[in-house]
């Protein structure tokens, strides 16, 4: 487990979270990549943050969980950058993503945030 991963997110919850990311991508707004995700967190625009567990070097995303915690934003850790990039609508992997407008996935994202909060 990477240094920046504070808790294990069960596979079924990861799958639900990635599906909600796809819905938010299609009906709302999603920020993709570490830099855009960092800006969304700092500005308080992110509803939920996704971080891949297979990022190398780890320092690229190491700041995100702590920054999100300071702002009261939940973080979902997903297994691979490819899964995250795919769900975010990219043809390549993505180390991080943030939902800034949930669209039709609003209720699902709130539920996932609550479940992730319980994991901590």
From Swiss-Prot:
GO cellular component, one term: ribonucleoprotein complex
Keyword Cytoplasm in annotation: yes
Keyword Phosphoprotein among UniProt keywords: no
GO annotation terms (biological process): maintenance of translational fidelity; ribosomal small subunit biogenesis; tRNA 5'-leader removal
Subcellular location: Cytoplasm
Top-level taxon: Archaea
An example Gene Ontology molecular-function term: ribonuclease P activity
Cross-referenced InterPro entries: Ribosomal_eL30-like_sf, Ribosomal_eL8/eL30/eS12/Gad45, Ribosomal_eL8/Nhp2, Ribosomal_eL8_arc
UniProt keyword terms in alphabetical order: Cytoplasm, Ribonucleoprotein, Ribosomal protein, RNA-binding, rRNA-binding, tRNA processing
Pfam families assigned: Ribosomal_L7Ae
Similarity section: Belongs to the eukaryotic ribosomal protein eL8 family.
Job description of the protein: Multifunctional RNA-binding protein that recognizes the K-turn motif in ribosomal RNA, the RNA component of RNase P, box H/ACA, box C/D and box C'/D' sRNAs.
PANTHER family the UniProt entry points to: 40S RIBOSOMAL PROTEIN S12
HAMAP family noted in UniProt: Ribosomal_eL8
UniProt subunit comment: Part of the 50S ribosomal subunit. Probably part of the RNase P complex.
Designated name of the protein: Large ribosomal subunit protein eL8
Organism: Halobacterium salinarum (strain ATCC 700922 / JCM 11081 / NRC-1)
The gene coding this protein: rpl7ae
């Amino acid at each position: 487990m990477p240094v920046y991963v504070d808790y294990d997110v069960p596979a079924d919850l990861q799958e639900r979270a990635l599906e909600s990311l796809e819905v938010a991508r299609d009906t709302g707004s999603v920020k993709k990549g570490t830099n855009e995700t960092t800006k969304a967190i700092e500005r308080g625009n992110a509803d939920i943050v996704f971080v891949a567990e297979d990022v190398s070097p780890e320092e690229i995303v190491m700041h995100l969980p702590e920054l999100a915690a300071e702002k009261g934003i939940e973080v979902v850790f997903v297994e691979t950058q490819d899964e995250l990039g795919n769900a975010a609508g990219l043809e390549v992997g993505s180390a991080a993503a943030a939902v800034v407008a949930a669209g039709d996935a609003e209720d699902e994202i709130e539920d996932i945030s609550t479940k992730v909060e319980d994991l901590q």
